[in-house]
């Protein structure tokens, strides 16, 4: 007999947790749609030459290549060596680039898309790191140009999502790659690849600490003078406290003697984002400037975001993203700038569960169980269930008569809150009895008012959370 087991690096949940996970997906989707984003889904596998055009090195080593055994057999029989190679997507950004380039003339720009699907990476399986995981992305794609105002709107989306998720206080940390690049230019670190390498090291500051970054930048790989490294560390230590302080920090940078044109461009973009964020109604306690945020990916060119939970910094970034100038340069001659964010929901959910932050009030998606006393009561039970479902109550029917105590036990174990009973006495009076297992109360209600009464009870419970 084969031992049942899941592959390493996958997250498989029991129904109680899956409901909580699904609720988070629903909240994210609802907020994405409220801000006018349209749903997109792309195939789980892509042609490998398309998928891997922009990648290489570590990314390519993590890709899962796939091919059907039938296709391989047919190719072997026919001697066809041109069988297209397929690969599972490792993020949602590259498939988006392909999608926009392929459908460019059918889309309306700026194109506002959200995508919530699983992606696959052959990473080393470890706690909290998955080979299959959900990403929940939004992007706004422009044609030729895209106003920095969209960068502010994306920040407002982040705030709306995590406010409704109610997983604790959070901070949206903002920076701009032009601001970083301009400051490094003023220190003589202007060469492209070298500057990108420094940015990657700076991005490790919160995870590895100042001593690690200092040793790395002074060391043989970079050889930056110690005095300049200290200036870099002082610069990236800047954190704003409130909206006015953020604007003051930017004004001071702009007025500095060593301020370069690139730095001033970054300051101007951040200033406009901050002013619009305030107009969008995001409270100043929800965001701050953090000059150490660089985002390790090379394609970010302007605004960058990272979001963290205030009381659980050990969880790390729960949402990140930024501005890029040319999404689909490998697939289209059109210039397609954009801005977007991604929520790695599988890892976030795992971290929240480990920290005890998952709300388990809804142990089941079933809200009512219609009990069955005897075979003669089956038609009545089915009629009651029909009425409940028509009234918006998720309902299960007990299909075989059992002792009422066992039916209560089943409902309690399954996490079903209400048990509806209709014996001969209740039927004669046109009512049903309802056992509320959450409040440990029993009451009677007319059949016509049953669904509306349960909806009120459920709404009151949600309001108390």
From Swiss-Prot:
NCBIfam families: hisS
GO cellular component annotations of the record: cytoplasm
Keywords carried by this UniProt record: Aminoacyl-tRNA synthetase, ATP-binding, Cytoplasm, Ligase, Nucleotide-binding, Protein biosynthesis
Compartments where found: Cytoplasm
Cysteine disulfide links: none
Name of the gene encoding the protein in the UniProt record: hisS
Enzyme Commission identifier(s): 6.1.1.21
Catalyses which reaction(s): tRNA(His) + L-histidine + ATP = L-histidyl-tRNA(His) + AMP + diphosphate + H(+)
Pfam families noted in UniProt: HGTP_anticodon, tRNA-synt_His
GO molecular function: ATP binding; histidine-tRNA ligase activity
PANTHER family for this protein: HISTIDINE--TRNA LIGASE (PTHR11476:SF7), HISTIDYL-TRNA SYNTHETASE (PTHR11476)
Provenance organism: Stenotrophomonas maltophilia (strain R551-3)
Principal localisation: cytoplasm
CDD domains found in the cross-reference section: HisRS-like_core, HisRS_anticodon
Subunit structure: Homodimer.
Signal peptide range: none
Keyword Cytoplasm in record: yes
Taxonomic lineage of the native organism: Bacteria, Pseudomonadati, Pseudomonadota, Gammaproteobacteria, Lysobacterales
Family stated for the protein in its record: Belongs to the class-II aminoacyl-tRNA synthetase family.
Tagged with keyword rRNA-binding: no
SUPFAM superfamilies xref list: Class II aaRS ABD-related, Class II aaRS and biotin synthetases
GO biological process: histidyl-tRNA aminoacylation
Protein known as: Histidine--tRNA ligase
């Amino acid at each position: 007999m084969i031992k049942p087991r899941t592959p390493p690096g996958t997250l498989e949940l029991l129904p109680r947790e899956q409901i909580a996970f699904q609720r988070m997906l629903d909240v994210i989707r609802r907020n994405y749609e409220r801000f006018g984003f349209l749903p997109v889904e792309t195939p789980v596998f892509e042609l490998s030459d398309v998928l891997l055009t922009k990648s290489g090195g570590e990314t390519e080593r993590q890709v899962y290549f796939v091919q059907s055994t039938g296709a391989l057999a047919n190719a072997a029989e026919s001697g066809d060596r041109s069988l297209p190679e397929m690969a599972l997507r490792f993020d949602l950004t590259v498939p988006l680039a392909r999608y926009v380039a392929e459908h460019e003339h059918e889309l309306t720009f700026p194109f506002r898309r959200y995508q919530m699907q699983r992606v696959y990476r052959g990473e080393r399986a470890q706690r909290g790191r998955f080979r299959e995981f959900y990403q929940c992305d939004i992007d706004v794609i422009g044609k030729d140009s895209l106003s920095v105002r969209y960068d502010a709107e994306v920040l407002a989306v982040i705030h709306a999502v995590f406010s409704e998720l109610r997983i604790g206080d959070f901070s949206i940390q903002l920076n701009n790659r032009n601001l970083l690049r301009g400051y490094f230019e003023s220190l003589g670190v202007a060469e492209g690849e070298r500057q990108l390498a420094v940015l990657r090291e700076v991005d490790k500051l919160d995870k590895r600490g100042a001593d690690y970054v200092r040793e790395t930048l002074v060391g043989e790989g970079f050889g930056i003078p110690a005095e300049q490294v200290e200036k870099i560390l002082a610069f990236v230590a800047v954190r704003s406290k409130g909206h006015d302080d953020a604007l003051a920090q930017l004004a001071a940078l702009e007025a500095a003697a060593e301020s370069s044109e690139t730095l001033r461009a970054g300051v101007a973009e951040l200033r406009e984002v901050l002013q619009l964020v305030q107009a969008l109604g995001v409270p100043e306690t929800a965001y701050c400037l953090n000059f150490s945020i660089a985002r390790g990916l090379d394609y970010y060119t302007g605004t960058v975001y990272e979001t963290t939970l205030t009381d659980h910094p050990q969880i790390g970034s729960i949402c990140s993203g930024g501005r890029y100038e040319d999404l689909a340069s490998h697939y289209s001659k059109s210039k397609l700038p954009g801005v977007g964010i991604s929520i790695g929901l599988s890892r976030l959910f795992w971290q929240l569960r480990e920290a005890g932050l998952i709300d388990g009030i809804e142990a089941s998606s079933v809200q009512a169980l219609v009990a069955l006393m005897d075979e003669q009561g089956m038609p009545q039970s089915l009629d009651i269930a029909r009425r409940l479902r028509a009234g918006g109550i998720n309902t299960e029917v007990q299909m075989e008569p059992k002792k009422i105590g066992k039916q209560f036990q089943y409902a309690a174990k399954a996490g079903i809150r209400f048990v509806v009973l209709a014996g001969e006495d209740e039927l004669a009076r046109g009512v049903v009895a309802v056992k509320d297992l959450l409040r440990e109360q029993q009451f009677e209600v007319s059949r016509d008012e049953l669904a509306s009464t349960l909806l009120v009870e459920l709404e009151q419970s949600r309001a108390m959370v």
